[in-house]
């Protein structure tokens, strides 16, 4: 089965071998050296002053960021299930929250965000997804973060980059907390997340002492000494060590970002050549999302007959979307096969006659022929 879901993504053989080595104990000097190396690489990757690793899914890092940085009121963008989650986190902690709702295919607008901020001076934290993976939407987080800081530099900008980190370069100058997750571009199993922090965020965290398991003040103190407050994500840390080696072998992150972008744009072209519609108005490079009334039938046929698994949508688009992953290191031939299978499935359902245009378009675009 070829797994093309946007998380958990397929784990290649090189990454799987990182889990097969003998288990080290996390309170040893040997593991501390690996932990230190991984954190230093993550700092370089994100461009932020500190990076904390957490033994949790990405939702844990979202919660940790909100409770650590928001003292008064929160503003969040809801353009899908993951944006909505920021509001649920705020409610669980009795934090007053202001919600900006957008259609799942529509990116957030800078002027609307600034309008809410100006009307509510108690807002001291803002949350948004870089990529809202419910629909594969890319928000203009860089422009939004800059505009917020120019309007009120005291507002902390929290960006869920779980499906953007490791996919494309992110401008983080005006970002205070950047959140990542193991099961996306890092090609690891779920259950590890990270929070990269600006200097302003570090100072806020050191002033406060909130949470227990997700107490970032405690984690900051311990991880600066190459250990963790509680049990470390040991195998995930070893996996990250291997991930950085693989990226280096590719030529570094610039090379990885180029390959991911080429695959994403080539897939978009192939999808359009099939007469299909791309769902978001501003597509992310992490996935290609198709909206189609036959989405459920196509996904089922692809899985059963062609051994290709794409993801569907979430309510209310559960049976209307097909999401094709581009995160991680994916061989070109696998992407080409998956798109060819999609065209064959369209033919099988009498929706379009097969003529090989998907594969041809993808390869021409990818190789610049």
UniProtKB/Swiss-Prot annotation:
Enzyme class: transferase
Disulfide cross-links: none
Key word Transferase present: yes
EC number: 2.6.1.-
Cofactor or coenzyme needed: pyridoxal 5'-phosphate
Keyword Isomerase: no
SUPFAM superfamilies to which the protein is assigned, alphabetical: PLP-dependent transferases
Similarity annotation: Belongs to the class-V pyridoxal-phosphate-dependent aminotransferase family.
Protein name: Uncharacterized aminotransferase HP_0736
């Amino acid at each position: 089965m070829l797994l093309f879901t946007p998380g958990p993504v397929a784990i290649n053989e090189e990454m799987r071998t990182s889990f097969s080595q003998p288990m080290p104990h996390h309170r040893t000097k040997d593991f501390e050296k690996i932990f230190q190396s991984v954190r230093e690489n993550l700092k370089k990757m994100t461009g932020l002053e500190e990076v904390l690793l957490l033994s949790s899914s990405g939702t844990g890092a979202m919660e940790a960021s909100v409770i650590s940085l928001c003292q008064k009121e929160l503003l969040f963008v809801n353009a899908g299930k993951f944006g909505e989650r920021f509001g649920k986190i705020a409610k669980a902690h009795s934090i007053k929250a202001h919600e900006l709702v957008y259609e799942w295919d529509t990116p957030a607008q800078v002027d609307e965000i600034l309008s809410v901020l100006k009307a509510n001076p108690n807002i001291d934290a803002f949350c948004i997804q870089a990529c809202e993976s419910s629909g594969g939407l890319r928000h203009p987080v860089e422009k939004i973060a800059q505009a917020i800081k120019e309007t009120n530099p005291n507002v902390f900008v929290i960006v869920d980059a779980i499906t953007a980190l490791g996919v494309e370069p992110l401008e983080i100058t005006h970002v205070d907390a950047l959140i990542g997750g193991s099961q996306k571009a890092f090609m690891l199993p779920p259950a590890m997340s990270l929070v990269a922090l600006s200097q302003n965020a570090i100072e806020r965290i050191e002033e406060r002492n909130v949470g227990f398991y997700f107490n970032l003040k405690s984690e900051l103190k311990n991880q600066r000494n190459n250990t963790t407050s509680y049990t470390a994500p040991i195998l995930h840390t070893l996996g990250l060590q291997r991930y950085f080696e693989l990226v280096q072998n590719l030529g570094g992150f610039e090379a990885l970002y180029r390959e991911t972008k080429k695959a994403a744009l080539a897939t978009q072209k192939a999808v359009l050549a099939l007469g299909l519609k791309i769902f978001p108005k501003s597509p992310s490079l992490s996935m290609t999302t198709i909206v189609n009334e036959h989405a459920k039938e196509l996904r089922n046929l692809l899985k059963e007959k062609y051994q290709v698994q794409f993801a569907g949508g979430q309510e209310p688009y559960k049976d209307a979307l097909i999401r094709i992953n581009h995160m991680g290191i994916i061989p070109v031939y696998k992407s080409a096969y998956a798109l060819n299978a999609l065209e064959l499935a369209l033919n099988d359902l009498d929706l379009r006659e097969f003529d090989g245009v998907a594969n041809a378009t993808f390869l021409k675009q990818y190789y610049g022929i």
